[in-house]
């Protein structure tokens, strides 16, 4: 049975976040009789992809379809990235894959030149960071992902966006979910549910389980 860690812990007072803590939970659950087959951390393969703010967009001097962008990534100086995305605009907050970063399918992004102009990374679409655009309000794969255009960020202030510059994009998008695959045997029918597994986790890790109250009108 597959259980998202956040959901599993939501009925307990357990605070389990780090890789070491998750490993300990999996190990202890297995020892207690609820075997863990696999722990999958979604988005873990995405590395050095951060939130960037576009400060400037200029046409590439040697191309009629490329743009040269200056991006604030929270460093001392802006970085320059060349893109062919037609939806790029000044003020956009976007995922920027930096030099020597890893995006979906294990692809590595390196700094280089496009038509003779230095480019220190790549701005990303949903697909390029391994996400399904259909899971986000107004999400699409037509060009670069722009955070302000997504329904999930419609109520966010400029101060909020400024505060996430340079942060890893996956946690910002809430896509850093850890999923645990349990092998539940027929004699443990009580664990064929999130509530059952949650109770088992609380007992195993010496925490408290709180059963949700269901109100019927």
Predicted segment positions?
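Phosphate-backbone binding interfaces of nucleic-acid-interacting proteins
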Residues: 1-215
